[in-house]
Amino acid sequence: MSPDQTAVEYTAKDIEVLDDLEAVRKRPGMYIGGVGVRGLHHLLWEVVDNAVDEALAGYCDTIKVSLHKDGSASVEDNGRGIPTEMHELGKSALEIVMTKLHAGGKFSKKVYRVSGGLHGVGVSVVNALSEWLEVWVKRNGKIYYQKYQRGSRSPEAGHRTEVLGETKEHGTTVRFKPDREIFETTEFKYEIVAQRLKELAYLNRGLKIILFDEREGKEETFHFEDGIIGLVRSLNRNRKPLHEPIYIETTKDGVSVEVAIQFTDSDVENIQAFANNINTSEGGSHVVGFRAGLTRAVNEYGKKHLKKFEPVTGVDIREGLTAVISVKVPEPQFEGQTKTKLTNSDVKTVVESAVYSGVLRWLEENPAQAETLLNKFILNKKAREAAKRAKELVKRKNELITTLPGKLADCSSKNPEERELFIVEGESAGGSAKQARDRRFQAILPIKGKIINVEKAGMARVLKNDEIKAIISAIGAGIGKDFDITKARYRRIIIMTDADVDGAHIRTLLLTFFYRYMRPLIESGYLYIAQPPLYQIKKGKKSYYAYSDEELKRTLEQVGGGEVQRYKGLGEMNPQQLWETTMNPENRILIQVTLEDAKRADELFSILMGEDVESRRNFIMAHSKEVKNLDI
């Protein structure tokens, strides 16, 4: 990443301004998607994306992200440094970038051919939504400095840029503290930051990203010379791969394509697709092109090398497939519920062509492994056709597979938009929930202690499990590739388990099941987790509830002590308490499950419940010190 520094000029005249910075503090959600945990971390991503863009342009190979004790975060890169010369608007280019919305060198594609970031609103929005922000630029042999408060320069600073000294280094450092007046929380989560930085390091081969948590004295370095090949290996670390990863790389018509493919003995399809470093969880043209190219290559090879070969479908081929698709597009277009579906039609053609020729070449060069894979695909086809015949036979015999489970206490409303289903752990708690609920719109489905471990069970075994069958028929929208979100009988599916280790285990099992077999529920925002209280505080005739240790401490201080009861199970609450604390829409706390939450649960479960004993041991050793409460 060290091209001739004079190859592309990056100066004040390259800074374009498309819009003024207005109303960001009044409507932050329009710019960063919300003021919760996701919006908070989006501030950090905006600054990180700028540094990664320097890496994509070839001028930066190291980025350091620090989470500081005072609640601020900083991002340091060794790129060219933001220009500091005077701009035609009468201010320094650095101040323009920091105070004007959509100002920067990314819009003409002259300075940056490709840039990342979903919203791409720029560091000015970070500035506007921070209590304070500092920026240091090492450029032209000098160190430049500016400081802002809630997006504005202090009156004494005017429009001046301070020069702190001389240097032979180059790059930009931005440090900011999110504004408590704007955000619901201002605490950066190490796990969220680490996951995103690790992902970026995989997607940008050779880029070194250092994460330092000053609060805990913890540091990690993410640096992967094998790029997305390493990501595929990591995704398959708890599964049995059938061959070494297939790697395809090409650039055509300005679109760069990288694909890594590896088949495993699992029956789960896992395709992760990215466009300009954005995780396109809703898929798009690059995924469509990938699937088409893969299917075409396999069928062409099979027709050429096997007698009496009958074409297999994409569904037959992709069972057990792990793939990472990464495209870099000059003008990406996104749509979909979360704006994470790529729609550029030209990308489909480029990806399909690259995957078709790359996979076909690999099959020709590896005949033994090709035969193993083809036999797997043919077996998958036979199993699919047999399952289809069995399904039709069941229908003909008029055995209604859509019959609602006997233990479901359904609600009276016929409108799916207002109906909600509580999946409750245990018959006892299920009984309390049935008494507590509002029968008009709340349905209760009690499930036994442990549902099946979907990590070790294939689709056939999953469908034989009574608890899973009850969940599938209650929701009424099918499963796997036949899942149809429009047929879901409820707008909210709420997981309600005990606040102990067993409850967490069952919750993780359910999240993994929904992620693997009913993912559209999560993508559409239908899945929630109930938050029952951990404590009841009795003071005289009054009862108070606390949902965390911090809230318990705060409540005890406010009411002046009291009798504390810790709830280990939902069954310890009577129906009235359960309604007041956990089920009443007026009072309850629900956590909406995101795709990232479910993905983390799935990865955690692969480690803890998979076949790889070594990974499980390493995970337990690494996290044993974090255990605070054990219900023994």
UniProtKB/Swiss-Prot annotation:
Its main location: cytoplasm. The keyword Nucleotide-binding applies. It holds the Pfam family DNA_gyraseB. Gene3D superfamilies: 3.30.230.10, 3.40.50.670, Histidine kinase-like ATPase, C-terminal domain. One of its GO terms (molecular function) is DNA topoisomerase type II (double strand cut, ATP-hydrolyzing) activity. Its EC number is 5.6.2.2. Binds two Mg(2+) per subunit. The magnesium ions form salt bridges with both the protein and the DNA. Can also accept other divalent metal cations, such as Mn(2+) or Ca(2+). It catalyses: ATP-dependent breakage, passage and rejoining of double-stranded DNA. It comes from the Archaea. InterPro entries: DNA_gyrase_B_C, GyrB, HATPase_C_sf, Ribosomal_Su5_D2-typ_SF, Ribsml_uS5_D2-typ_fold_subgr, Topo_IIA, Topo_IIA-like_dom_sf, Topo_IIA_B. Mg(2+) 2 binds at residues 498, 500. Keywords: ATP-binding, Cytoplasm, DNA-binding, Isomerase, Magnesium, Metal-binding, Nucleotide-binding, Topoisomerase. GO terms for biological process: DNA topological change; DNA-templated DNA replication. It is found in: Cytoplasm. One of its GO terms (cellular component) is chromosome. Residues 419-533 form the Toprim domain. The record marks 450, 453 as: Interaction with DNA. Its cofactor is Mg(2+); Mn(2+); Ca(2+). Mg(2+) 1 binds at residues 425, 498. Belongs to the type II topoisomerase GyrB family. Heterotetramer, composed of two GyrA and two GyrB chains. In the heterotetramer, GyrA contains the active site tyrosine that forms a transient covalent intermediate with DNA, while GyrB binds cofactors and catalyzes ATP hydrolysis. Few gyrases are as efficient as E.coli at forming negative supercoils. Not all organisms have 2 type II topoisomerases; in organisms with a single type II topoisomerase this enzyme also has to decatenate newly replicated chromosomes. A type II topoisomerase that negatively supercoils closed circular double-stranded (ds) DNA in an ATP-dependent manner to modulate DNA topology and maintain chromosomes in an underwound state. Negative supercoiling favors strand separation, and DNA replication, transcription, recombination and repair, all of which involve strand separation. Also able to catalyze the interconversion of other topological isomers of dsDNA rings, including catenanes and knotted rings. Type II topoisomerases break and join 2 DNA strands simultaneously in an ATP-dependent manner. This is DNA gyrase subunit B. It comes from Archaeoglobus fulgidus (strain ATCC 49558 / DSM 4304 / JCM 9628 / NBRC 100126 / VC-16). The gene is gyrB.
